[in-house]
Amino acid sequence: MKNILITGGAGFIGSHVVRLFVNRYPDYTIVNLDKLTYAGNLANLKDIEDAPNYRFERADICDYDKVLEIFERYDIDGVIHLAAESHVDRSIKDPFNFARTNVLGTLSLLQAAKEYWTRSGRMTGLADAEANAMLCRFYHISTDEVYGALELTRPEGWAASGQSESGGGPYGDDFFTEETKYQPHSPYSASKASSDHFVRAFHDTYGMPTIVTNCSNNYGPYQFPEKLIPLFINNICVGKPLPVYGRGENVRDWLYVEDHARAIDLIFHKGRVAETYNIGGFNEWKNIDLIKVLIKTVDRLLDRPEGFSLHLISFVTDRAGHDLRYAIDSSKLKRALGWEPSLQFEEGIEKTVRWYLEHRDWMENVTSGEYQKYYESMYSNR
């Protein structure tokens, strides 16, 4: 498989995957399909935009005819599907748009892949599913939020020496595994759960070689600042309030984006079709503790006194359906393919903060205009 369609490749995770594939596989043709909504930014790929093996197509994944035409023009034999609406707060305000993009858009891609791969002889039916995997592959990236929420069961101050297979993490005994049943609680996670089911259905019904992965929260360079880490780095820099839902007790597992891109590369090339793999960072943090780490790191790098920005923390009304804890078990991926995160969380945060401080122009460009209106509408009255 050498003609790879990467959807959402101008976004946060997608741009890291596109860059990795363009640089690592010069004999591949990498086609980046992106609608360029508010979170898509071609400046994320400025360093590889002139690479001879890179192509960009501005298109909506819901436009079936356009998607099929791209399959035909580039003879696409592999898909890495990252395009999605992904912000929970936005999904609560506009669930229809999330259903359209995440469910119908995924279905459009699946149908175009089935049509073209069947016509080109790469897919020959359910009975030949294993053989089909040698000729084409559809890799769908999903989220740990489809699993619902876990409980906080550790006493305050408890510290774990190991996680997952060793029997627990810092905030609870249990983890999401690939066998955890789906219990989505937000319009966003419900839309992703539905798209996951469609991907698996195309394998079970048509023999399409599919893989699904569910990842934890990503962080790193080029993340649009509606997400917690880049939003708060920017706010700390300029002295704006840091709106914290509830009391900041919610727990998330954090994964450095370049580690995620490495996992995607490995799974795309060596993962078993019809399998699901969890990709997590084994880095559980309460939101309030993470925010204090960000404050400490930004203030130190800006030569401010320790604790200088702590007063910016502002507790706001919690959002509806706010899951308490996510923790994902990546043991299967480590056993099967040898992947594990390369960075400790503190090292990843240091790299991330330094990147945003060194790229203030990028941040200023993406936080102007319509984003400012959205930010005010979300947090000004809480």
Each language-model region and where it sits:
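N-terminal Rossmann-like NAD(P)+-binding domain of SDR-like oxidoreductases, especially those catalyzing
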Residues: 1-218, 258, 268, 287, ...
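C-terminal substrate-binding subdomain of Rossmann-fold SDR/epimerase-dehydratase oxidoreductases
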Residues: 4, 30, 59-62, 108, ...
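Residue-level detector of secondary-structure boundary/capping sites
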Residues: 189-190, 223, 285, 324
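Active-site helix-initiating loop/hinge in glycosyltransferases
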Residues: 220, 224, 253-256
